[in-house]
C-alpha cells in the first residue's frame, strides 16, 4: 500500500471519528433536552395534583360550613331566643366536625404546604368574619326569618376569602343560567361551557370535577369546577311545586334530589 493510500484511509478514519463525535454530541443534546422536558412535565403534573388537592379541601370545607348554617336554621330563626350562642368559634368547630365525618380526616394545617395553609386559613378567617358580622341579626328577638341562609353565607364567605387571598385564589358558587338567583353568581363563559357541555350531559360521571389550566384575568391559572346536586335539605327553597314562592319570596326551581343545582368554581393562580 502506497503512502497516498495510507493517507487517504487516515483522512477517512478521521472524518468518521469526527462524524461519530458530532452525532454523539447531538445525542447528548437530545438526551439533555428530553430530560429537561421530562422534568418540566413532572413539575407541571405535580403542580396540578397539588392544586387539585387544595381545591377539593376548599370546596369540602365550604360545603361543611354551609351545612352548619342549614342545620341551625331553626335556632337562627327562633324569634324567642336572644343570645343563641352561635359564635364563630363554635361555628368553625361544627364545620370541622362535618368535614371530618364526610372526608374522613381532619384539616391539620401544620401538615400542609405554606400556600395551602394560607388558603385554608384565609377561608376560615372569612367564615368567622361572616358569622361575627351577623351576630346582631342572628340574635335579634322578635324576628323570625333572618335571611342568614346557606347560599347567602357561602356568597359572603367567598367574597371575604377573595378579599384576603385575591392574589392567590378565588372561590365562588355558580349555576346554569336558568337556576341563578343572584346576578353575582352568573357563570362566566368558561363556567357556562363546562356546565352545559359536561355537567348537564347524561354521560358525565356524577360528582366528577372538571379541571383545566387556562388564562384568568391575564394570569395562568388552574381552574376547577365541582358539580353540586340538590339534597333533601335544599328542596324547601328549590324544590316543588315549581314557581311556588319559598321563604325568601323567590319562586322555587322545581328541583328534585340528585338534580344538578350548581357548581363550586375555584381559581388558583400559578
Model feature map: region roles:
Residues 43-229, 243-270:
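Extracytoplasmic c-type cytochrome modules immediately beyond a signal peptide or single-pass transmembrane anchor
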Residues 1-23:
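N-terminal secretory signal peptides that target proteins for export/translocation
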Residues 13-16, 32-34, 46:
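Contiguous N-terminal and early-domain "leader" segments and peripheral loops that mark the onset or edge
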Residues 230-242:
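The canonical Cys-X-X-Cys-His
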Residues 26-27, 150:
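Extended, compositionally biased low-complexity polar/Lys-Gly-rich tracts
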Residues 8-10, 46, 241:
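Intrinsic structural disorder/low-complexity segments
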Residues 28-40:
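Bacterial N-terminal signal peptides
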Amino acid at each position: 500500500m502506497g503512502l497516498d493510500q495510507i493517507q487517504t484511509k487516515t483522512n477517512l478514519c478521521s472524518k468518521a471519528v469526527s462524524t461519530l463525535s458530532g452525532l454523539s454530541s447531538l445525542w447528548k443534546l437530545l438526551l439533555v433536552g428530553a430530560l429537561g422536558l421530562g422534568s418540566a412535565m413532572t413539575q407541571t403534573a405535580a403542580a396540578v395534583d397539588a392544586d387539585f388537592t387544595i381545591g377539593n379541601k376548599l370546596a369540602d370545607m365550604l360545603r361543611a360550613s354551609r351545612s352548619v348554617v342549614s342545620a341551625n336554621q331553626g335556632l337562627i330563626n327562633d324569634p324567642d331566643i336572644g343570645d343563641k350562642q352561635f359564635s364563630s368559634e363554635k361555628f368553625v368547630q361544627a364545620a370541622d366536625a362535618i368535614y371530618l365525618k364526610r372526608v374522613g380526616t381532619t384539616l391539620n394545617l401544620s401538615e400542609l404546604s405554606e400556600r395551602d395553609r394560607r388558603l385554608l386559613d384565609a377561608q376560615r378567617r372569612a367564615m368567622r368574619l361572616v358569622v361575627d358580622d351577623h351576630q346582631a341579626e342572628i340574635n335579634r328577638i322578635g324576628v323570625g326569618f333572618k335571611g342568614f341562609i346557606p347560599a347567602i353565607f357561602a356568597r359572603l364567605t367567598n367574597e371575604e376569602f377573595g378579599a384576603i387571598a385575591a392574589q392567590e385564589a378565588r372561590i365562588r358558587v355558580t349555576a346554569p343560567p336558568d337556576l341563578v338567583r343572584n346576578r353575582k353568581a352568573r357563570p362566566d363563559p368558561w363556567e357556562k361551557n363546562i356546565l352545559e357541555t359536561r355537567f348537564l350531559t347524561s354521560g358525565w360521571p356524577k360528582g366528577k370535577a372538571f379541571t383545566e389550566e387556562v388564562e384568568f384575568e391575564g394570569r395562568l391559572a388552574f381552574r376547577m369546577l365541582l358539580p353540586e346536586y340538590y339534597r333533601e335539605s335544599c328542596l324547601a327553597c328549590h324544590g316543588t311545586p315549581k314557581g311556588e314562592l319559598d321563604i325568601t319570596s323567590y319562586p322555587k326551581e322545581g328541583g328534585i334530589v340528585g338534580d344538578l343545582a350548581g357548581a363550586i368554581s375555584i381559581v388558583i393562580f400559578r
